[in-house]
Amino acid sequence: MRALRAGLTLALGAGLGAAAEHWRRREGKAPGLLGRVPLLPVVAADLPALPGGPAGGTGELAKYGLPGVAQLRSRESYVLSYDPRTRGALWVLEQLRPERLRGDGDRSACDFREDDSVHAYHRATNADYRGSGFDRGHLAAAANHRWSQRAMDDTFYLSNVAPQVPHLNQNAWNNLERYSRSLTRTYQNVYVCTGPLFLPRTEADGKSYVKYQVIGKNHVAVPTHFFKVLILEAAGGQIELRSYVMPNAPVDETIPLERFLVPIESIERASGLLFVPNILARAGNLKAITAGSK
């Protein structure tokens, strides 16, 4: 318990702390991982409001409720922040330990299912994926949570899924997931934050556009890329950071994974999340691993 609190606090920031506390008060208690995690990733839009503003303050402005707040979901095996616009997660956070990779969790007993905690207007369904040509790609991988059937079942909520090109899902991305699990043999704790990216492309007119496909009647957004950030606790207190980006396209699985390492700043800029300031605030020894580094 103490290690979980310390590690997740190392990795992640306080920006959503208020939202998490609101969620706890509303529910009376927080089930699953969220009940043990005090601080979550920072999204710029969720940072505390600046002082000032209209007379009467936010209390009067919120008389009829706010149209939306951070949608946190806590499961047995992970925590996610949900984006109702894309019908998917902004990020999913999980902790990998050797004992959690073993157990009675049986994938054949799992079924993909809607997340009933998400409003019907804003959630994906299995019908959205049917005939789309995309896999239902896990963000928190099922194989990461064999330690209980419930933990594995929770990875099959469609809120933990994104449309993924089958060749990527079954090959290069799967290799990255397997590599992440293998690091539990070397590091004391492995924290994994995974999410979608929607990156701009420069077109023939010289202008840059963010364009992405949507699938199904619920218009589930198809990411252009995916990121995975690994926060690794080594012996002696050193924290290592490895950050990867892969395109949502067929990728040659023989390409070494280190070719997909990117500076963490590029993920922070593209995703709107912040990792490094929060790690540095709690750890004096951070080593960022990038392509070609030793």
UniProtKB/Swiss-Prot annotation:
One of its GO terms (molecular function) is DNA endonuclease activity. GO terms for biological process: apoptotic DNA fragmentation; cellular response to calcium ion; cellular response to glucose stimulus; cellular response to hypoxia; cellular response to oxidative stress; DNA catabolic process; DNA damage response; in utero embryonic development. Mg(2+) binds at N169. The modification Phosphothreonine is found at T125. Gene3D superfamilies: Extracellular Endonuclease, subunit A (3.40.570.10). Changing C110S: Shows a 2.1-fold higher rate for the cleavage of the 5hmC-modified DNA junction over unmodified junction, as compared to the 1.8-fold difference seen in the wild type enzyme. Keywords: Disulfide bond, Endonuclease, Hydrolase, Magnesium, Metal-binding, Mitochondrion, Nuclease, Phosphoprotein, Transit peptide. The active site is at H138 (proton acceptor). SMART domains: Endonuclease_NS, NUC. GO terms for cellular component: mitochondrion; perikaryon; perinuclear region of cytoplasm. Residues 1-44 form a transit peptide. Residues 283-293 are annotated as: Essential for deoxyribonuclease activity. Changing R107Q: Loss of deoxyribonuclease activity. Signal peptide: none annotated. Its EC number is 3.1.30.-. It is an enzyme of class 3 (hydrolase). Belongs to the DNA/RNA non-specific endonuclease family. Homodimer; disulfide-linked. Homodimerization is essential for its activity. Interacts with YWHAG. PANTHER family: ENDONUCLEASE G, MITOCHONDRIAL (PTHR13966:SF5), ENDONUCLEASE RELATED (PTHR13966). Endonuclease that preferentially catalyzes the cleavage of double-stranded 5-hydroxymethylcytosine (5hmC)-modified DNA. The 5hmC-modified nucleotide does not increase the binding affinity, but instead increases the efficiency of cutting and specifies the site of cleavage for the modified DNAs. Shows significantly higher affinity for four-stranded Holliday junction over duplex and single-stranded DNAs. Promotes conservative recombination when the DNA is 5hmC-modified. This is Endonuclease G, mitochondrial. It comes from Mus musculus (Mouse). The lineage of its organism: Eukaryota, Metazoa, Chordata, Craniata, Vertebrata.
